[in-house]
Structure formats: structure tokens, C-alpha cells
Amino acid sequence: MSTGSSSTSEITEISTFKGQEQALRAGRLGTAGLLLSVLAASAPLMVVAGVMPTIFGLMGIVGQPILYVILAVVLALFSVGYAEMSRHVHNAGAFYAYIARGLGATAGASASFVALVAYSAMQVGIYGIFGFEVSNLFATYLSTELAWWIPALAAVAVVGVLSWLKIDLNAKVLGVLLLIECLLVIIFDVAAVADPAKEGLSLHAFNPDTLTGAGFGTALCFCIAAFVGFEQAPVYAEETSSPQIVVRRVMFLAIGFVALFFALSSWALTIAAGPSAINAQAGKLGPGLLFGLSEGVLGKSFTDVLHVLFVTGMFAAMLSFHNVVARYAFAMGREGLLPAAFGRTNKSSGAPGTGSLLQTVIALVVVIAFAVTDHKPTGDPTAPVLHLFTWMGNIGALGIILLMAAASVAVIAFFVQRGAGRAQVWRLVASGLACLALLTIAVLTVKDFDVLVGAGPGSVLSWLLPGIIGLTLVGGLVYGLVLRSARPDVHARIGLGNEAFQLDKAAEAAAAGTANM
């Protein structure tokens, strides 16, 4: 396998010799299907309606569009090396497989559990805000009080069923929901620009001076969560028709789309409210900012539809993250990091059924736990939004930032160890710069974690919640060391995926040939 060039031989299918039950079905996804699947995780409408008002209102950052551009540059630098790595390693456990190849199997074992916890936390957290918003819809349009956990548990069941189906069917469901919500946001953006507030078409939001203040670091941490999803593309490499081409293309398309879409949408919000008034309005209305501005320029009927799509967009994100967790569990089961049952797929759909069931059970337990401890009246956002959604979302975001930083180092090590450092020098420089930027963001995230989760200064949550990722990281390292000592055969397979099975196949063939001599 050449590592000094970006050219690779054509691979028509990736499977294992142990049968299709231990292989994800190849050829299920093309560029469009994969792009829609990873973009669904970014939940465009949830970001515009939920994240952006928080940054405007609580952190006082008017120049939010600049933040998305800055992060796009950082993540594009990260993707230069990450995408090249995806041409050489096709594994549903993308992050941990890359880290294992570059930094060793023990580091890969640790990364696998960090990835599992991080993506699971992000997925489960969305059930909170989903249940809360569905409850609001019932109260608004049906005058019916509904506890948030009822629609949340219903969503757990529906997502669990859909995840057992073929991934191309999942992509179609995600694609339809994503396209509709993006279209509605674009309509709002155009309407806001066409009918601006009294300050007119101001470009004040693109002025770097608007980034000054104590809220900059925290705002950067909030914004990076909007990009989460693009890095999932290699997770589906085994299910794409041409992974060497499709995965790389989708990552850069996703980063470009997210940066442009969110930069323009956050600017449109400042135009609709006025740059001088946006922070005050966002602080007063919160997630209602978008809907209030929308009703003013597009009317109540459009805004009602926007409310519904806000909910379906969250559902799409839950399904997207669920699929990723299931595939990480599959990859870990296939390589012995989890019980072998997780490394098998459904015979009918080719989906990682046991991994999907694992995430369904985790979501069920967490939602029930938050529901049981919620003693607030119906309609109160404390448990579902301020706790479940905010806590879990920030735990997940921190884990993913650290994984990206580690993967950047792994990319450098991977190519240098193979004597391809000179041929890949610019990609390695890009990875190094990305690592420094991502570590800076990680430090800011931990430093401001009390602000991110809405806790007071000195709150136990400021170290307890990020400590979950730290504990997982250390626990994974210990587990990796135990495997190296007690089960060296399993340790040697970490990160190899299908290649480990192909090596076994070659060894068995060689042994059979020797026996027949």
C-alpha cells in the first residue's frame, strides 16, 4: 500500500472472509447519501434556533458569522490529513482506527471508548430538547399538557427501529428532513435580507471587533458543536461505493456547506433584528428568537411549519448519531474490544443490529433516569434542556474535540513511520496546525465548562462532567494495556478492521497449503 501518494487502487467491495454477518454492506451509499447522513448530525435548524440565540444573548458575541469561518479553517486543516488517512484505512471505527494506526493499539483502545461515550452522549442529549419541544407543540396547538419524557421515549423506540433498517433507507429519511429544514432556513435568510430592520443591510457582524470580550472562548466552544458530523464520513467508508473518493469529497463538502450556511444564517439574524438589538432580543427570547423574527417577516403559517421542522431536524440528528454509535460498537466488537456479538450485522439489512440495540438501551436508561429525577412542572425546561441536552451535548463535544486533536497527531505519525513524511509534508503541516488549534479549543472548553453547562463558578459540574471523558480516556488506556498483556492477539488487531480478517485468511490458506504438501 502506497502512502507517499494520494492515488490508490480501486476497491470494489470491502468485506470480511468470516461472512456478511461480520461485514457492513458495501455500495450502500454514494456521495449524496453520505453527505446528507453526516449533515443531518449538524441539525441546521437546531443550531440556528438554539445555539445562535445562546451565543448572541448570553455571550454577547455579535460577530458570530466570523466564528464559523474561523472554525471552518481549523477543521479544513484537520481534514487535509484526516481525509488522506481515510484513503488508506477503511474502518467503521474511524477515529480510533486512525489513532491506533498512528499512535499504537493501546491509544486506539482508549480512543474507541472515548468515541463511543462522546457520540452516545451527544445522541442521548438531543432526546431532552426533542421531548421538550414536542411537549411545547402539544401545548400550543392541541392545548394538551404532555411530559417531555413521553415523546422522548417514543423517539427512542422509533430511532431504534429505523436504525435496524438498511443504511440507504436511513439516508433517504435523513435527506428528506434535512433538505426541507435547510430550505426553510434559506427562505428566512432571504426574507430577512430583503426586509431588514431599521439598521439596514449592515455588515457589522463581520467586523472582528465584535469578537472581543470574555465570551469569545465560550462562544467558540458552542460553535464547534455545529460542525460535528462531518468527521463521521469515514465511519461509513465500508458502506460506500468508492471510499477513497467519496469519503474525502463528503468531508470537504460538509465543512464548506456548514460554514457558509451558518455564517449567512447568523448574519441574517442580525439583519432581521438589527446588530444593535440582536443580543438583547436573543437574551429575552432565547430559542424563540428565530420564530419571533420569522413570524414578523414571513407570517404565522410559515413559522408554524418552521416549528414542526425544528422537531424533525432534531429527530434526524438523533438518527444520524445513533447510526454512528452503532457502527463504532460494531467495529469494536469485530476487533475484540467489545463482546463478539457487537461485531455482527443483521442478515437482512446489513445494519449493525447489536450495536444499535446497545445505544437504544443506553438512551432508554438515561432518559428514564432524568425523567424520574425531574420534579418540575410540565413545560419546565430544567431537566430536559438545561440538564440532559446541555450536559450531554458538551460532554460529547469535548470528547470529539480531543479525538480530532489525537487523530491529527496520529496522521503525522502514520505517514512518518511509513517513510512518507516528505511526500506528505504539507498534509502533515496542516495536521500539526489543526492539532494546536483543537487543543486550544479543548482547553477553553474545560476552562469554561461551568459556563457551557450553565453552572455557577466553582460548581462540582465544572469538573465532574468533563471528568467523564477523562475517566473514559484513562480507563481505555488501562484496558488497552491489559489486552496487550493478557490477550496480545486481540491487542494486535485493534484498528485493523477487515485487514485483520484478511491476514487471518492468508495465514489459514498458507497453513492449509503447507499441510497438503
Predicted regions and their residues:
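Helix-loop-helix junctions that connect adjacent transmembrane segments
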Residues: 16, 20-25, 64-65, 141-147, ...
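A generic transmembrane alpha-helix motif of multi-pass inner-membrane proteins
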Residues: 51, 393-403, 425-517
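Membrane-interface "cap" regions at the ends of multi-pass membrane proteins
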Residues: 1-63, 75-76, 200-207, 483-517
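Membrane-interface loop-to-helix entry segments
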Residues: 29, 148-198, 228, 249-259, ...
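Membrane-helix boundary/coupling elements in multi-pass transport proteins
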Residues: 91, 114-129, 232-239, 300-340, ...
